[in-house]
Design a protein with these regions (language model features):
Chain A
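Beta-alpha junction/loop-to-helix N-cap segments that form part of ligand/metal-binding clefts
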Residues: 28, 35, 49-58, 67-138, ...
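Loop/turn elements at helix/coil->beta-strand transitions in domains of secreted/extracellular proteins
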Residues: 34-37, 72-76, 99-104, 123-127, ...
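Extracellular/periplasmic periplasmic-binding protein-like sensory domains
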Residues: 244-314, 385-391
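Short beta-strand segments enriched in small/hydrophobic residues
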Residues: 34-52, 108, 170-176
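Segments of small-molecule ligand-sensing domains
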Residues: 301-310, 322-379
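Periplasmic-binding protein-like
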Residues: 96-109, 129-131, 170-175, 224-234, ...
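Extracellular/periplasmic Venus flytrap/periplasmic-binding protein
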Residues: 136, 143-248, 284-293
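Short, low-complexity disordered leader/linker segments with a strong preference
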Residues: 1-37, 66, 391-393
Length: 393, 289
């Protein structure tokens, strides 16, 4: 009997990663009021479709429920759509909190949800394990801790990479500024300058979302940039590299953030000779390896496409499942908050940093990226190691 | 100074695009009396039909004509909507209808073309023609300009010298009277729409590889295009042509100047404002006197 119990415990820890939580293995979460309610607010319809994020989270919960739940407790997961509209985002969050009585949020991927709802989460004492945080508030609120690195930390990391590993001297950065992101990108550049003791050669915050990029590329070339970092999204990456080719620009490393990391971008640029690099949020999703193994298995079982966004949803769901599993007693907003704010590091193979929520006033736990290079219409990992930034002071 | 020249030349490729779309906007307004907000979206639809065929392995010799035909078809469809329900409506109502159609077309287009996911646009004309002030002037931007110039000249001659041209002018000035004297108003109007659709589709196919390759960005090219048309007061093809080029060049210069570059997006609006003030100056001064 004793053998059987320990066997069960071992398998439980193995499957749910309880050991990594450092929590007591005998924890037994209970749910007297029915299934545990979780939810997320994501941009699903509207200007972009980030539904892969929450769908990835849902796949984790569905498969957990099918296997009997956590200590018999199943999870009911509500995916709300903010349509890229702040008002809808606010309503969606209130609906999840007041009507659905969610105990926590997680796995959401939205353009603006953090900025709109951080205050609501604070007032209602509910925490959010954001799947893909985009707006600066995702990384600057006490109630939100995303599982992704985010564009700002990635900016710092990629500048550092360009300077240290690609040996570029004159680094230039061109940013598209949407909403209140200017300050966050400026901070990201400053952080790199403080870290490296170097100064950036040129910063241009006026890159247009739509429009011709030729004048900007000419400016970069004529200013003598060795590397150009931008926060372009998918179509912009393609446009930029095509324009660089049309202008026969040579000798500039083009550096992008995770927003350019899709197979569509790689396929649209099969013949370019420009050196193109970018930093990923997690283990590169295009690679089949052990680190991606569990995520891939979950996605395949759910019949979902394997995208970077689904990694975010998956990882956030894992964090929530492991947090709930470590609770001894009823699963409520309070108990989840207590567990998350303990700030114990949680380790997952698809991320380069340990995930920590903790009780700080703002959170950006993920500080590691893997660098990919475009080669023959494919993204190829440049290194197998994580490129990790030193902790923020 | 040299860098300013480089920025100006760099603005040429955008200018060519604005010019052809601006000329098409004047064309639509003069002949069917519609301020057409869907101009670029029609072209985007045709372009994406071409890209879809190209991506599924068809050669360009099939893809390009099919795309042009698709653009003409979408434009004809909009023409049918306009002539069936809004033939007698005021110009502002018609403009509002096309603005509403634009929103609809973008929404549907984004869904059908996979949202922001980029497509691999084949370059119909590759390479650069020459290098000027350190900037490669691409064959594509020269071709766009050429299309704009040829379209302007041909249309002017056609309207001035042919019988159909005369009928078209009658149609736009007094549609009711034209109908009464036996001109086949509806057929002519639909032909105008089809021509606009075909021309913008081809122009956008040439422009697209160097623009942000998604449906919305291409559709929104209509904003600077309408500014260009306004410079021609929606009547002069040549003024719209030059206006489009000027907007492109001013945008290029502005992005080379740090102080101005963040207001670059506002340039079409500033141009519209300046033109309105200038064109209304007579009325204002007369009143003051």
């Amino acid at each position: 009997m004793k053998y059987l119990t320990s066997l069960l415990l071992t398998s439980a820890t193995a499957c749910c990663g309880l050991a990594l939580m450092g929590g007591s293995a005998a924890a037994a979460p209970t749910c007297e009021d029915g299934p545990i309610q979780l939810g997320s607010v994501s941009t699903i319809t509207g200007p972009v479709d980030f539904s892969d994020g929450p769908s990835g989270a849902k796949a984790v919960f569905d498969q957990l429920n099918a296997a009997g739940g956590i200590n018999g407790c199943t999870i009911e997961y509500t995916m709300a759509d903010d349509k890229g509209d702040p008002q809808v985002a606010a309503q969606a969050a209130r609906d999840l909190i007041d009507n659905r009585n969610v105990v926590a949020l997680g796995g959401g991927a939205s353009l603006l949800e953090c900025a709109v709802n951080a205050g609501t989460y604070k007032r209602n004492d509910v925490l959010s394990v954001q799947g893909v945080g985009v707006d600066p508030m995702c990384f600057n609120a006490p109630t939100i801790a995303p599982v992704n690195v985010g564009p700002y930390t990635l900016t710092t990391a990629m500048l550092d990479y360009a300077s240290n590993e690609l040996k570029n001297e004159k680094l230039c950065a061109f940013f598209i500024i949407l909403g209140g992101t200017q300050e966050a990108y400026a901070q990201a550049v400053k952080r790199w300058e403080a870290m490296s003791g170097k100064t950036i050669h040129l910063v241009d915050m006026t890159l247009p979302l739509q429009g011709d990029l030729t004048p900007y590329l000419i400016k970069a070339r004529d200013s003598g940039c060795d590397a150009v970092l931008t926060n372009q999204v998918e179509p912009g990456v393609v446009q930029m590299i095509n324009t660089a080719d049309a202008q026969k620009i040579e000798g500039i490393d083009w550096i992008f953030l995770a927003s350019g990391y899709t197979e569509g971008v790689a396929k649209a640029l099969p013949d370019t000779r420009q050196p193109v690099y970018l930093g990923t949020e997690w283990e590169p999703y295009t690679e089949v390896n052990a680190a991606n193994g569990d995520w891939m298995a979950v996605m395949e079982k759910a019949g979902l496409a394997k995208t970077a966004f689904s990694q975010g949803g998956y990882l956030a769901a894992k964090v929530l499942v492991d947090t709930i599993s470590s609770i001894d007693g009823p699963v409520t907003r309070e108990t989840i908050k207590a567990k998350l704010t303990e700030g114990k590091p949680m380790k997952y193979s698809i991320a380069g940093s340990d995930y920590v929520f903790g009780d700080a006033a703002k959170h950006a736990p993920m500080q590691a990226t893997k660098v990919m290079q475009l080669s023959g219409g494919k993204w190829v990992p440049r290194t197998t190691d994580w490129y990790v930034l030193p902790p923020v002071e | 100074m040299n860098s300013l020249l480089a920025s100006a030349v760099a603005g040429l490729s955008a200018g060519g695009a604005y010019a052809i779309l601006g000329v098409c906007a004047v064309f639509t307004y003069r002949l069917v009396a519609v301020v057409n907000f869907t101009g670029a979206a029609i072209g985007a639809a045709g372009t994406f039909v071409m890209v879809t065929l190209y991506e599924s392995g068809y050669p360009l010799a099939i893809g390009v004509p099919a795309g042009i035909a698709a653009g003409a078809l979408v434009a004809t469809w909009i023409g049918i909507v306009m002539t069936t329900w809004f033939a007698g409506a005021s110009a502002s109502t018609k403009a509002a209808v096309t603005a509403a159609l634009l929103v609809g077309i973008i929404a549907v287009g984004l869904r059908l073309t996979g949202g922001q996911h980029p497509h691999s646009f084949p370059e119909l004309v590759t390479g650069s023609a020459f290098r000027f002030a350190g900037v490669e002037v691409t064959r594509a931007s020269l071709l766009t300009l050429a299309i704009a110039v040829v379209f302007t000249l041909v249309t002017e001659q056609f309207l001035a010298r042919t019988r159909t041209g005369l009928q078209l002018r009658a149609l736009s000035l007094r549609p009711m009277a034209a109908e009464l004297i036996g001109i086949r108003v509806r057929l002519l109007a639909l032909c105008v729409w089809a021509v606009v659709g075909a021309v913008t589709s081809f122009a956008l196919m040439v422009i697209a590889p160097l623009r942000s390759p998604d449906f919305m960005s291409l559709s929104l090219l209509v904003v600077p295009a309408l500014a260009a048309a306004l410079i021609g007061a929606f009547t002069s093809f040549r003024a719209a042509l030059i206006g489009g080029l000027m907007i492109g060049i001013i945008e290029g210069v502005a992005s080379g100047l740090d102080t101005f570059s963040q207001y670059r997006g506002a340039i079409p609006f500033l141009v519209i404002l300046a033109v309105l003030l200038w064109s209304q100056r007579g009325a204002r001064w007369d009143e003051a006197r």
